Amino acid sequence: FDEDGVRTRVVNADHTAMLDVKIPQSSAEVFDFNEPHPVEIGILIGDIKDMTKSLVVKDALTIEYNTGDPTWLTLSANGVQKKVRCKNISLIKRLKVPATDHKWSMNLPWKQVKAFLGSCAKDPLFEILVNVQMVSLNAKSDDETLTLDLPSSEIDLHIEGESLITHITPAHFISLMSTTSAKTVFSAKGSAASVVETEWTESGLKLKGWIAPRT
């Protein structure tokens, strides 16, 4: 927490995908921060998941933290209040942004990418093939071949080089982008066999994600 808003960073269990979420002060209905310095707390996602997973778009979630009583984070929604015990921040490992190498960048429509990923969600990997003409997402199995081609003119594609390939696990990509609405266009950056970085805005939240390649 700081005067600009709230920020959190989470990573999945096998450390193959990481998400950075920023909630700007302007995106909150009410925001009150009276500390002279930023305040950090540590919580387990599982401790708050049950409180948040039932919320819909019009619901309001109130988050309260009192430095005078630093043991608890209080969540309130729809008349229900939950107090979550905070963890010792000094014992929590800091999540560092992975090294990235950006040789290509593009703006992708989530609706089409989601349709592709949903069709190969159980596959171990899919291919991102980027060249000057297009990006091609490809998944293969013994029974089928799945392809999504998006021309460079439609996705604002920029590339250094002729052709670059990266392999990603579909389930990790779907999980990382799970908060994304169908109409959202997200930016993606990467290189050959490198971390793929994504960035988008959703309902006032600023989100940035990183997905490790399959090697």
What positions do the PLM features span?
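DNA polymerase sliding clamps and clamp-related checkpoint/processivity subunits
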Residues: E3-K122, L129-T215
